[in-house]
Amino acid sequence: MLDGSLLARWLAAAFGLTLLLAALRPSAAYFGLTGSEPLTILPLTLETEAAAQAHYKACDRLKLERKQRRMCRRDPGVAETLVEAVSMSALECQYQFRFERWNCTLEGRYRASLLKRGFKETAFLYAISSAGLTHALAKACSAGRMERCTCDEAPDLENREAWQWGGCGDNLKYSSKFVKEFLGRRSSKDLRARVDFHNNLVGVKVIKAGVETTCKCHGVSGSCTVRTCWRQLAPFHEVGKHLKHKYETSLKVGSTTNEATGEAGAISPPRGRASGSGGGDPLPRTPELVHLDDSPSFCLAGRFSPGTAGRRCHREKNCESICCGRGHNTQSRVVTRPCQCQVRWCCYVECRQCTQREEVYTCKG
């Protein structure tokens, strides 16, 4: 589990985190963090092979559902983008929940149990997975790593000029269409599936809402005789923040859940919320996360998490909450870190090694 206060520190440490995608029931099409197979350590860059159809083998190694595998094989760049998307989603999930009792534990048995239930945490996993794929695919298009898509083709922007001047727009139109088809949708009679698909779409919509128009002026002496504009996605860290807020305000739609199967029964619309289309559909029209079941406390080890015993916490920030009232242990240790760094000509950084004493807080069992 990743336990750091700075995103950059553990982004580098978790470089190798990726996926195996699940082959579920024929009518299902789940992806990444919401698959039933365990996440597996693989390189972010798939090994190169001399064969012309090497990407076929890459798609097969991901163990996709039949339709997903067919879509993967259409373009040599898809397989690597899928791997990148899941890694990005997992890292962002763990970063957003680093101060919470549930810190996005992705070990196989905990995640498998969680996905059988319609918790808020489950809703977040669906949203962050679809958002990660949408973001990664749009970026792959604009970076030229895909054969079936290039830069954004927004009719209101001068993409020819944007491309000429190096301002290639992220192709959200292609990526969102691909993701909706890739994730698919089971029968509308399957209520749990409709909730999952709704949360998938929330992830896509948050990506769309974060698109910004970036412009650059060109002309003599800094004049703006020509202005080139292109569309650009928000950093994925911002997407994660928005989805975390939606997690915190997730709407519960009533359910009866079979403990053995995790299948949801009848659900009723949340009070005061407009129903969606489809005659009595309880899902909101607005892009809000929805869940079926109340979440456990995640305080003690169980089916859904390893609990919080031994978890590091910050005394002034979250020890009381994370430790669930059990208190925390304090350990003093001496650490050595680079300090007083200076750039020397040419071309290296010279640092002193400074020692300092720090206190580490961990939850009692």
Swiss-Prot record:
GO terms for molecular function: signaling receptor binding. Keywords: Developmental protein, Disulfide bond, Extracellular matrix, Glycoprotein, Lipoprotein, Secreted, Signal, Wnt signaling pathway. Palmitoleoylation is required for efficient binding to frizzled receptors. Depalmitoleoylation leads to Wnt signaling pathway inhibition. Its main location: secreted. Glycans are attached at residue 103. InterPro entries: Wnt, Wnt9a, Wnt_C, Wnt_CS. Residues 1-29 form the signal peptide. Belongs to the Wnt family. PANTHER family: PROTEIN WNT-9A, WNT RELATED. This is Protein Wnt-9a. It comes from Mus musculus.
